Amino acid sequence: MTKPVLVLVGHGMVGHHFLEQCVSRDLHQQYRIVVFCEERYAAYDRVHLTEYFAGRSAESLSLVEGDFFTQHGIELRLSESVASIDREARVVRDAFGHETHWDKLVLATGSYPFVPPVPGHNLEGCFVYRTLDDLDQIAARAATARRGVVIGGGLLGLEAANALKQLGLETHVVEFAPNLMAVQLDNGGAAMLREKISELGVGVHTSKATTEIVRNEQGLQLNFRDGSSLATDMLVFSAGIRPQDALARSGGLSVGERGGICIDNQCRTSDPDVLAIGECALWENKIYGLVAPGYQMAARRAATLAGEAGSFSGADMSTKLKLLGVDVASFGDAQGRTPGCQSYQWTHGPQQVYKKIVVSADGKNLLGGVLVGDAGDYATLLQMMLNGMALPKHPESLILPALEGSRPKALGVAALPDGAQICSCHNVSKGDICQAVSGGAGDMAAIKSRTKAATGCGGCSALVKQVMEYQLAEQGVEVKKDICEHFPWSRQEIYHLVRVNHIRTFEQLIARYGQGHGCEVCKPLVASVLASCWNEYLLKPAHLPLQDTNDRYFANIQKDGTYSVVPRMAAGEVTPDGLIAIGQIAKRYQLYSKVTGGQRIDLFGARLEQLPAIWRELAEAGFETGHAYGKSLRTVKSCVGSTWCRYGVQDSTGLAVTLEHRYKGLRAPHKIKMAVSGCTRECAEAQGKDIGVIATEKGWNLYVCGNGGMKPRHADLFASDLDEATLIRSIDRLLMFYIRTADRLQRTSTWMDNLEGGVDYLREMILEDSLGIGEELEQEMARVVESYQCEWQTTLNDPQRLALFRSYVNSDEPDETVQRQTLRGQPQLAPFAAQGEPALPSRPWQAICDLDAIPQQAGIGARLGERQIALFRFGDQVYALDNLEPGSEANVLSRGLLGDAGGEPIVISPLYKQRIRLRDGRQCDGGEQAVRAWPVKVENGKVWVGNQQLLARAEAS
């Protein structure tokens, strides 16, 4: 018996998802399936299309697994477009006139990019951003261009702008509307997005109507209605999409007034045997331009063909994504257009975070919201909206930082109904995930495999994990609290192992109590524990591979790969000569200078190779390191106290100096801040610090476990009218007990709140020595105090360590991408305009350095011709990758931590903690190409690097 024929026109993301849904229902056995694909590539991931410019190949973007078509007997016709539909004859004709019969016809023709019909839109140098072929043309043009302009400031336009930036172009975005992402964001969110994108060096031009595009001697020029103009070398149109409905029109199918193939709840067109799904389909006068609704249409249509009940009833258009490195989320009625609705907004200007929620008139339901700069609340808020969950009495608490005594605002997954949609891309509910866990799926890999949750855009990953862990706990399965895959221990247990067994190195610890090579979680944690216990020099060969970039170079890394320098100024005291020396150094090295809230001076913009020279001059002027880079004591802030102030009752400055010099260099689970006030007027703000001291007529009041920041907490009064010796003894005990028992990266405030008994328990333990360990804690602190060393002074006296402070092991040239401009009389970051791709050496192999020049289990920067690369020494192997950290403009990958993930050697980038495989430069999770990888060989102790990237060599072969 001859099978009926199902023809699918269009093989994009939605089209392929339809095929997968058909296969899962065995429809490939009921139908002969023929697929027409206009492009030369089978379906690929358009969501991550920009990664193509980061070195990801067309093959890695493909959505087609292995021999999918052969295995399931589906016929794929690549580079074949359908020219017409003959509904009476039930055939489609391709561009060559060949006819293919169909019994069911599915149109998944997608959309095409909208190009405004302005004069000059078709000039050479004008492109659209839609397909891999489009991207190849853009890349070819960008190789000889300096500046690129994108017309369109929506989702697609900002994606295209990101692509141009990755190609090294000076990038501008032109938008007709007053705001970027005008559909998704309100005015406040759009303003914050614009501010953040502008800081990245992207020019933003809103309210610009392009009247013409002309060619001149310099290239292209856009002329605007307001009389202004903008010159460019190339232009990319990414101003939205239009449904690809021409085929349906020619076949006499019903289409919308503004385009789109009209469909019903079963995705049927005006001809019941012709179906339409995805961006070409118009459902209730609405075109869905996101992949998740298209997937839902595809799944619904396949289910209907298989005889299952159900219908397509619309889809949530909420979205969460990262645009040019900026987290953005929009859901529901983001613009607040519902009659009578109320909105709450919160802005954190310094951190460039904007949050807004819209609630119903009665304040009972969440209707929508906008998040820019921090989208961490997206999953919680979206579930509350989709499931109609009751709002708290004060809805604003959902977006405000948690205050003292308030409960966490995160929504417990136990409160979600089983039908709550967790993954919109694949329509996976909470119940689906719980069922998968009950069926034996006990980790994220198994959940993804069984349900496909978190395999689409990935935005639901955190919530999927929460549901999985909830169900595991419900089944009585212990959810491990191991710090990472390398150590089945908590931080407290690791501290105990190190202290009791006198373990002095990471290698000793992992050999006895762990496995593998470590990661960005356990290495810095163990480094901190070792320093708290033994206080050895951090750059000893055994300790260097554990240090994050700030501790490895004793400075705070900034967004452009330079560092900030903070000399210690105990209690804020500084001599006139000291001030003059700091000013002269800042001027000599062109450093941006700023007074900090901790009463110190911060100098920004020091290149890696400049740090030793800067610190040599600071040391000669009497300064030592301020430990602004470490999880350690930062500052002890003070007022002038009784020395100068008429209200002061004690010498607060003198005590602050004593405390700062006592605890400087103390490593802890998190940073420690202190303050001393000379009277109850509290000018030093001691009650907002980890350790706060306020003078009284009889002595000192001690306050503990406060902090400022995003979640401020008022410190608790711990003891009153203490003499100085008792005060210091109490602080010694409390800090060492905190170091012993706190979790990883846990501030003192959270630590105390999690202690059973809270501050009362601490008083008994510290003041009354209820556990009998007071003297032991004091002795541990005494050893730390006695073993203090200024890390910079030690480094300056060690030529071998100084050799690590260089940007390139084989060149003394500075990083050309670090540029400065003057603003308010001071040096500031300036965008770097790349002049095409850096030149590679003409010879196949270039000698870079001696093997011993690369630290064991660490990396160092180098130059391959003019290209910046990172060399990593992992055991007996040497690897070479591009030095540019993905998603940044900083050549800093060489300063990342080395480790492994499931035995796979990886580097963890220093700025944004991205896990990248050393062998091929791909992302550890997902396999997307992150950076280029280069061949390496070691001969006679010399490291050589090849001039043809590994990916290109592999594809050529």
From Swiss-Prot:
[2Fe-2S] cluster binds at C423, C425, C457, C460. FAD binds at residues 44-79. Its EC number is 1.7.1.4. Gene3D superfamilies: 3.30.390.30, BFD-like [2Fe-2S]-binding domain, FAD/NAD(P)-binding domain, Rieske [2Fe-2S] iron-sulphur domain, Sulfite Reductase Hemoprotein, domain 1. GO terms for molecular function: 2 iron, 2 sulfur cluster binding; 4 iron, 4 sulfur cluster binding; flavin adenine dinucleotide binding; heme binding; metal ion binding; NADP binding; nitrite reductase NADH activity. It comes from the Bacteria. Homodimer which associates with NirD. This is Nitrite reductase [NAD(P)H] large subunit. It comes from Klebsiella oxytoca. The lineage of its organism: Bacteria, Pseudomonadati, Pseudomonadota, Gammaproteobacteria, Enterobacterales. The gene is nasB.
